[in-house]
Amino acid sequence: MRPAVAARFLEFTRPLEGTVEYMYVDVKGLVTIGIGNLIDPIGVALALPFVKKVGGAATPAEITAEWTLIKDADNSKQLKTKGHTACTALTKLKLTDAAILDLCTQRLSSNELELKKVKEFKTFDEWPADAQLAMQSMAWAMGGAFAAGTLWPSFRAACATMDFDGAAANCKMNESGNPGLIPRNRADIHLFKNAAAVLAGEADKYYNRDTLYYPLVLLKPIVITP
């Protein structure tokens, strides 16, 4: 991953996800925390350094009890339809800012490893920074293995040849029931189109792959022939 992507990823994704220090459930009923970090199943939560809002470390029993409460498995509280603020008064535990940053850093790295297992993404390290950020954005929303197996065939085929215009045309995630994906989809399309412009212009030194140009809108060089 290019340094600019690692350095600016949270700046990019935080406005799309928000930052929540306590457990809540997303629209799918999955327990989440931080900047859109899934901690479901419970084993993921138990590995984290939760502390009490009033101070002091949380015990495994306290983490388990709160996770179970927020999971709302029978949907009696209908938390997944109410947003994270509905869980504020229900929670007594939290993660510190440092713990959230560490969790996000680990997830970004693990997503990259998963992405590179897909044969069409093997050249990921060669991609322009804007394309890498778009791919990490999709992985943040769907998981690093989102394109494994036979999933996303048209998108994978475009990425295999670094056809980032094709990637832009085939990267849209399903927004049904999850309107929060609308701005992320818009950003990802923008990023892939930028990456296509970078490849088109790099030979003439208009652009370079290490630079993350987003949120600028890049244009491909215009070739004028007599």
PLM region spans:
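Short conserved catalytic/interaction loops centered on acidic-Pro-aromatic/His motifs
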Residues: 127, 145-158
